[in-house]
Amino acid sequence: MARPDLTARLHAQRALRDAQGRRRTRRTVTRRDGVRLEVDGQWLTGFCSNDYLGLAQQFSVVNALQDAAAREGAGAGASHLVCGHHAMHEALEREVAEWLGYPRALLFGSGFAANLAVQQALLSEENDVCVQDKLNHASLLDATRLAGARLRRYPHLDTEGAMRQLKHAPDGAAMLATDGVFSMDGDIAPLRALSLVARLQQALFYVDDAHGVGVVGDGRGAVAAAGLSVDDVPLQLVTLGKALGGSGALVLGRDDLIEHLAETARPYIYTTAVPPAMAAAALEAVRLARRDHWRRTKLTDLIALFRSEARRHGLDLMASETPIQPLLCGDDHTAVAMSTALEQAGWLVGAIRPPTVPEGKARLRVTLSALHTPEQVRGLVEAIANARDRVTLAVREAAPPPLPAFA
C-alpha cells in the first residue's frame, strides 16, 4: 500500500475549504488609532478587537514598554529556569497573584501554551481524564489531546452533564475545565455549581478566564465575581492579550500546583521567557485595570446600549452581558456577506464560521471596547441592520421562482 502523500492531502483539504467557502486569510493593519484601523488603504472602525479596556495603546503602558526595553533589551535571553526570569517577570507574577487573591502565578508566552502546560504536567498517567464544556476554547480541548489524557465533554453550561461525565470516568485522576467567559458566545460559566461538582467528584477545577479578567465584576474576572477563591478554583488562567492589551498569560494557583508546573511543564521549561519589556507593559496595564474603574463602567454602558439598539432593530442577539456580542446569521454565506457589506460601509466586524463555531451557527462576532463612543455603537447597529436587509433582499432575488401550483 502506498504511503499517503502529505502535499496531496493538504491540497485536497484546501480544495474542500475552498468549496465550503471556509478559507482563512489574514488582513494587514497598516496603522491603528484606538478603534480605528487602516486596512488595504481604507480606514475602518473596528468592532473585532479583544482590547476591551482600551489599554493596548494607552500612553503609560506604551511608555513602560519603551523604558523597560531601553534598560533590559529586546528579549529575556533564556528560559525562566536558566537565566531568563527577570525582576519584571517576578513583579508581574506577584502583582497579578495579589490582585486575584492567589498565592502564586506563573508567566507564559501565550494562553495556548499555558493550557497545554497545565494538562501536560498534571494529567500524566494512564486513565487520567479532563472533563470539559463542549464550547471551551480550542486551546483547552487540544491540550487534553496533546497531553494524552482522556477527553470527555458535556453540553454547554450543563452542570449535571459535567457530573455525569466525571462519574463515568472513575478510574483516573480528574480535572474539570471550563472557560470563564466563552469566547464565541460571550456567556459566563456557572462556576459556583461547577466548583461543587468538582469537589464532590474529587476533580481539580481549572478555569480559563481569558475573556473575564479585567472586565467581569470588579475587574478580577468571573471567578471572583462568582464569589470563589483558590479553595474552590485551585488553578485559573488569565491572559494579558485581551482586556490588558498586551501579550502572554499567567496561571494562578496553590503553591504546590504552581511549583509543580514550574518544575515539570514542558511548555514552560523549554521556551524562552517573555521579553521583560512586555512584562513591564503588562504590569502597568494591570495597575490601570485595578485603578481605572471608569473603563469598566463605560464598557458596561456601551454593552447595554448595543443590546438595546440591537433589539430595537430586531437583530438576533445571544444571551451575553460581556463585551462579546455575537449576532447569529445561521449559514456561512450570510455571515460573510454581512461582514463584507459592513466593511464596504466602513466597519470591521469578523464573520465566524465552522469549525470555530458549530455547523449552522455562523455569526458576526461584535466586540466592544471602552474606547468606542455611543455614536459609534449606534452607527454600527444601524449598519448591521442595513446589511441584514441588503443580504436578505439579495438572497430573495437570487432564489428560483416558485413552481406553478396545480389543481
Swiss-Prot record:
Q: Might you name a Gene Ontology BP term for this protein?
A: biotin biosynthetic process
What this protein needs as a cofactor is: pyridoxal 5'-phosphate
E.C. no: 2.3.1.47
The molecular function terms in GO held by this entry are: 8-amino-7-oxononanoate synthase activity; pyridoxal phosphate binding
Give me the reactions it catalyses: 6-carboxyhexanoyl-[ACP] + L-alanine + H(+) = (8S)-8-amino-7-oxononanoate + holo-[ACP] + CO2
Q: What class of enzyme is it?
A: transferase
Give residue numbers for the modification (N6-(pyridoxal phosphate)lysine). 242
Against Pfam families, the record matches this protein to: Aminotran_1_2 (PF00155)
What keywords sit in the KW lines?
A: Biotin biosynthesis, Pyridoxal phosphate, Transferase
The entry sums up its family as follows: Belongs to the class-II pyridoxal-phosphate-dependent aminotransferase family. BioF subfamily.
Functional summary from the UniProt entry: Catalyzes the decarboxylative condensation of pimeloyl-[acyl-carrier protein] and L-alanine to produce 8-amino-7-oxononanoate (AON), [acyl-carrier protein], and carbon dioxide.
- For this entry, the protein name equals 8-amino-7-oxononanoate synthase
The organism encoding this protein is Stenotrophomonas maltophilia (strain R551-3)
Taxonomy of origin reads: Bacteria, Pseudomonadati, Pseudomonadota, Gammaproteobacteria, Lysobacterales
Q: Which gene encodes it?
A: bioF
